[in-house]
Amino acid sequence: MERTLQSVVGRRRGSSNRGRGKNSLISTPSYALHPPPRFRYPRWEFVRQTEYSMTACVRKGKLVLTYQYAIWKRVWTIETGFTDPSLFMTPAGTHTTEEIGHLDLFWLRYCSCPHEMPPWLDFLRGTLNLRISCRRALQASVLTSTPRHSLQRLAALQLCTNACLCWYPLGRINDTTPLWLNFSSGKEPTIQQLSGHP
């Protein structure tokens, strides 16, 4: 049976844009043309649509948290109302937040201790020490009750992980001070240290 396709070249399998004119309406999306840049994000933040990074800075004397999802341009900022951020730095370099808009509702809901409801402001100021078992229960309840990769889980987890740590004052903090501080050396930690690699 002779072939019905009468072209000199033979049957064209799907060649990518080569033999056709470049004026087709649907073009290859630009992100598919070039290989994605490597090491654009820290190695613990693989680019998924749901992953965010959090930084903190001081604006007009108040601590401002900034959340940015890895592949979106949009940045969320949450003003905490703190005037002295050194109170809210832990040795690990993480931040706790007192009033993050409506997120403190989640905080109030999930900080229930098995024995009693801890006064949450004391908890935040670091004057209240939860027992370790309570803190583990607290973390577990946060993980089961909040959606993954959400700001509310982030805030609640940070609040409950910072519970039993002691607070170190950092000295004077102004707009240029980096808030990821390594407490042993006083410098910013490397990405390896931040991501938990030795």
Swiss-Prot record:
Key words, A-Z: Host cytoplasm, Virion
**One cellular-component annotation, GO:** virion component
Describe the effect of T127A. In strain: Isolate R29-Nadin
Pfam family of the protein (one): Lenti_VIF_2
Q: What is the effect of changing T4P?
A: In strain: Isolate R29-Nadin
One further remark on this entry is: The sequence shown is that of isolate R29-127.
Q: What is this protein called?
A: Virion infectivity factor
Q: Which organism is it from?
A: Bovine immunodeficiency virus (strain R29) (BIV)
